[in-house]
UniProtKB/Swiss-Prot annotation:
Disulfide bond residue pairs: none
Gene designation per UniProt: MMP1
Lineage start: Eukaryota, Fungi, Dikarya, Ascomycota, Saccharomycotina
Name of the featured protein: S-methylmethionine permease 1
Cytoplasmic side: 1-77, 124-143, 204-215, 275-298, 378-402, 450-473, 527-583
Keywords (A to Z) from UniProt: Amino-acid transport, Endoplasmic reticulum, Membrane, Phosphoprotein, Transmembrane, Transmembrane helix, Transport
Function: High-affinity S-methylmethionine (SMM) permease, required for utilization of S-methylmethionine as a sulfur source.
Length: 583
């Protein structure tokens, strides 16, 4: 973008930012409620003068930077979304299948994926603080790599959330059926569906408040388990047989054979457990302060250490990897396969007392994922549509900042949850998930690579690092390391899919885990054919747009806030500066 175009866009940003969105007319409660669903027209469209002078690409960038979301999310919301978003069935139940590969394999797998996740969140926070747009991952890829890459990543990531929604609704139903097996499971699907949609109809505040309290419940439950686990390892407990320590690391051992293949087998389970951590970056458009996003991202290190690594070590000490109950669960929500329940049941009566509590924890965890699916998918749909990558109708926003069309599309996918009454629902969801099986790794790679490209473009165009609102603690090297690590994780997953542990190779098994790769390639090629662009395979560093994508006034205010915070932290004692470095 040349100097004239940059100045023109800045004028539009400044002149339109002072205009306010039209308020709901009338004082009648019913009238206000009805009006809240009307389209939230952009201030630029109302003024129309300078906006009409922009090119189509500039209009898209302006619309992305000025989306009419309500900035209602506080620091406490973002922190709990970042923590609670990852505490789901992947941790409470899925950990069991990974433990069957051996406690050392489980620990190494979680350390590798955790290191990748740390890089991803830091890179994502840097980009989202700089360019706070809805559907940020896909749109950042379109800005820093190539529009076709961005479209492919965006569709794949969106599919992951849309397909997860009905699956988690089924999970809610199966979990509740533990207490009421005689009730038609479709009834529980309907209740979970209505509740999750209603919470999101209250906007970002409704989603965030519900996530806040559900996350507190999950965190308390996990802390209780950690404390009980430490006591049991030390030889305490009502029916203790003495000190356990690392007994099961020696017999039956630390690694299941074959070692490397079992290690690779833990990657997808670990990724599924960590998935959702990056969602805190999606909230940047609705956060009261950009600094809240950066603070939440910084805390990722401690969340990984406390909630995953410590838990994995305790589970590995309390449950032998050859326990048949680890892989005997009838579904991904079967608490009998939960290593938490197995660990406590190994002590005698405690296991029967805790099963109902653990089922409640799993129910909260599964419903929390349902809630997140509606929130994340609707924002992704709205962002992609605003960027011109989906039909314009999908960009519809009402006056309360709710992407109603995006929510409706997610709700339509949610109706697949009623397949719970079908005998073939397991097969259906297995192949639906195959559509986005390892999209975790491809999305995470893309986030890290975008940050690397952003830093390279800043250097190539002679920009100062002071212009970066929030700099990743790991710098560009964290992005490079994250890229390499995610490529290795994908290679490991392809290997174990082609030659699975304990069963012969088959095309069905391979595509169950790797179908997303050819689908992403097909979407990429299809978008490139649609664009009819075969000359430019990537955006050159000098051509990357570093200026648009944020409101000028908000950008300057955020820089001022950042500088004041730096001065405040530098005036504090050493212990506080260390604390703020990590948190």
């Amino acid at each position: 973008m040349d100097e004239f175009e940059s100045t023109k866009l800045s004028k539009v940003q400044f002149s339109t930012s002072v205009l306010s969105t039209p308020s709901n007319e009338g004082n009648n409660l019913i009238h206000r409620f009805k009006n809240s669903f009307k389209r939230n027209d952009s201030p630029a469209i109302q003024e129309g003068l300078l906006y009409s002078e922009l090119s189509e690409e500039e209009k898209i960038q302006w619309d992305l930077a000025n989306q009419p979301y309500k900035k209602v999310l506080d620091q406490r919301h973002l922190t709990m979304i970042a923590i609670g978003g990852t505490l789901g069935t992947g941790l409470f139940i899925g950990l069991g299948e990974s433990l069957a590969s051996g406690p050392a394999s489980l620990l190494i797998g979680f350390l590798l994926v955790g290191a990748s996740m740390l890089c991803v969140v830091q890179c994502g926070a840097e980009l989202s603080c700089q360019y706070p747009v809805s559907g940020s991952y896909a749109l950042h890829a379109s800005r820093f790599i190539d529009p076709s890459v961005g479209f492919s990543i965006g569709i794949n990531y969106l599919l992951m959330w849309l397909i997860s929604y009905p699956s988690e609704l089924v999970g809610c139903s199966l979990t509740i059926s533990y207490w009421a097996p005689s009730v038609n499971p479709a009834a529980w699907v309907a209740i979970a569906f209505v509740l999750s949609m209603l919470l999101n109809l209250f906007g970002a505040r409704g989603f965030a408040e519900s996530e806040f309290y559900m996350s507190i419940f999950k965190i308390v439950a996990l802390f209780i388990f950690i404390i009980i686990g430490i006591v049991l390892i030390a030889g305490g407990g009502p029916d203790s047989t003495g000190y356990i320590g690392t007994k099961y690391w020696h017999d039956p051992g630390s690694f299941a054979v074959p070692v490397f293949k079992n290690l690779c087998n833990t990657f997808v389970s670990a990724a599924y457990s960590f998935s959702g951590t990056e969602m805190v970056v999606l909230t940047s458009t609705e956060a009261r302060s950009v600094s809240s996003v950066s603070r939440a991202a910084k805390g990722t290190f401690w969340r990984i250490i406390i909630f995953y690594i410590v838990t994995v070590i305790i589970i590995g000490c309390l449950v032998p990897y050859n326990d048949p109950r680890l892989i005997s669960g009838s579904s991904s929500e079967d608490i009998t396969a939960s290593p938490f329940v197995i660990a406590l049941s190994n002590t005698g009566a405690m296991g029967t007392r805790v099963s109902h509590f653990m089922n409640a924890v799993i129910l909260i965890a599964v419903f929390s994922v349902c809630n997140s699916c509606v929130y994340a998918s609707s924002r992704l749909i709205q962002g992609l549509a605003t960027a011109g990558q989906l039909p314009k109708i999908c960009a519809y926003m009402d006056r309360n900042g709710r992407p109603l069309v995006g929510m409706a599309i997610c709700g339509a996918f949610g109706l697949l949850g009623f397949l719970v009454v079908s005998k073939n629902q397991g097969t259906v969801f297995t192949w639906l998930f195959a559509l986005c099986s390892i999209s975790f790794f491809t999305t995470w790679f893309c986030i890290c690579f975008c940050q690397v490209r952003f830093r390279m473009a800043m250097k190539a165009q002679g920009r100062s690092k002071d212009d970066i609102i929030y700099r990743s603690t790991l710098g560009i090297y964290g992005g490079i390391f994250g890229c390499i690590l995610n490529v290795l994780l994908v290679i490991g997953e392809i290997y174990v899919s082609a030659a699975p542990v304990g069963s012969p190779s088959s095309a069905a098994n391979f595509f169950e885990y790797c179908m997303s790769i050819p689908i992403m390639i097909a979407v990429y090629i299809g978008h490139r054919i649609y664009r009819r662009d075969w000359r430019h395979w990537y955006i050159k560093r000098m051509d990357i747009d570093l200026d648009s994508g944020h409101s000028l006034e908000d950008f300057e205010a955020t820089k001022l806030e950042r500088d004041e915070d730096k001065k405040y932290v530098s005036s504090k004692p050493l212990y506080y500066r260390i604390y703020r470095f990590f948190c």
